[in-house]
Amino acid sequence: PKTDLATRIYAVDGVQLGSFYRENRADVRYADLPPSLVQALICTEDVRFRDHTGVDFRGLARAIAYLGKKGGGSTVTQQLAKQLFTERYDRTGFFERAVLQKPKEWIIATRLERQYTKDEIIALYLNRYDFLNQAVGIRSAAQVYFGKSVAGLDLHESAMLVGMLKNSALYNPLRRPELVLERRGTVISQMVKYGVVPASAQDSLNALPLGLSYQRVSHDEGPAPHFRERLRAEVKGLLDAKDG
């Protein structure tokens, strides 16, 4: 799938001078994702991810039985399908979403499963998700919220970011830290439930603060701003001339 990645500018010695973007996104490979992040995602969002072919009919039946109150039944692959191709029905009710949107997601999710490996689907999903505050994709989210690379995320940090996947506007750590802590606890609880985290570690993990190290991202930040702006203008001129 096509993605809009940030354009990064490097000096001759390899130091990054800055970047330009519509969305502050830079992809990471599955191999660079810490195990705790992948485990948190699967335990919380799609525990049968490795077994289904895009649609989890057991989860869907549960969602219908409880009118969506115990999860919407969407797999990670369906959520990726929604990100990539389908319209959003944010103002419609549960049954309207089930009738109008779910069939599209099923078809696209099944096709994605045929075209990509499970690991690739996880990476695609995390690379595209909007974590707000100029953090599009997991790499930007790790940098913006914790000042870290993705590989350097600790378990409780991974759990916070996975918790945001349910609704990043609601679980915005800069606006609702108490609610985000509660949601992080839910993610950790799921990891304990499925044997990824020992029960003996749950209380100590929940006691940790969010530990945010918010890094505001802007086009204007970084060395040589005038040079970067001149370079941007020159490159834009070359591309416009080529298109013309």
Question: What is each model feature region?
Answer:
Residues 198-244:
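Non-catalytic structural connector segments
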Residues 4-6, 10-198, 241-243:
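Peptidoglycan glycan-strand catalytic modules in the bacterial/periplasmic cell-wall system
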